[in-house]
Every structure is written in structure tokens, then in C-alpha cells.
Amino acid sequence: MNRITIAKIILLIVFFTVFKDNSFNYEIDKIYPKLLILRFNNKKYMNDELGKISYRYEGLSILDGHNFPASFIKKSDRIYELVKKNNIEYVIGIYDSESFLHEKLHAKYYFNKKYKQKIDKEWNNMKVSKKNKIITFLKNLGYSDKVLIDEYQAYKYSEKDNFFNLD
């Protein structure tokens, strides 16, 4: 092999190593047909693509998974056309399977009125001291007031029993 061929091979290896993970796949959910699920190949690219939208919605941009109503997507966001074309109301984004349940629970809270009523009732009937501990915990994670109940239910049903350190 000559030097030019070796240089081309090295360049291709570097190119595919650097750029291979900057992609995502998408699917329309079968249970909630107005839900768009974005599956990213790496966390950094996911946060680069969805972080600004999540920040508009919940006050955080660097996350292990993203969820937001489509109304928070601007024309300048790269996923705008995909969302518009498919008449999407809600989006979740993940880069690994560990965060899928958590993000899907956000969609359930958004789409399933009975489930939302059940969670809201549970929250409203909770002892004030317990609720205040959960609020403090979630605010320390950086969540805004408007998503506290939604985050509470997603963590409660996707994490270990004592996730909120209430014991």
C-alpha cells in the first residue's frame, strides 16, 4: 500500500469513529399514535438535539432522557418538520434502554387522562411533609415547579422503592 491509500484508510476510520454515533432512529408509538420516540446513539448528540427544547419545557437541558409536548418545539429545531409531518403531540428521546420506562411514563401521564387523575389524586392526598421532601428532592435535581408531579410519578414507577429517600 502506498502512503495515499494508508492516509485515506486512516481518514475513513477517524471519520466513522467521530461521526457514526451522530444519528437517531424514530418511531411512532403504537399505544399513543401522537407520541414520537427518538432513539439516539449517544447521550451528547441527544442532548445537543433536544436540550434546548427540554430547557424551554422543564428547565433542564442535559438529561439521560427527554420528554416534552410538541408545542415547545420551534421551527428552528431540527425535529420540527418530523413532528409536524406526523401530527405529533408529545416527544420522548432516549439514548439507552434504561431511561425508556421513565420517559414513557411521562407520555402516559400526558395522554392517559385516567392515569393522570389517579396520580394527581395521589399527589393531592399525600401528607404535606412527604410532599415537601419530594418537592425539595426534585428541585435539587433542577426541575421547575410546572413538572414536579409528572417527574414524581415517572421516578416513583421507574426507580427503586426508596428513590426519594423518604425513610
Short names for language-model regions:
Residues 114-123:
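Short acidic alpha-helical/loop segments enriched in Asp/Glu that coordinate divalent cations
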Residues 84-91, 123-167:
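Metalloprotease/metallohydrolase-associated module, dominated by Zn2+-dependent proteases
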Residues 110, 114, 160:
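Glycine-rich, acidic and aromatic/proline-enriched surface loops and short helix-turn segments
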Residues 1-8:
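N-terminal Sec-pathway targeting helices
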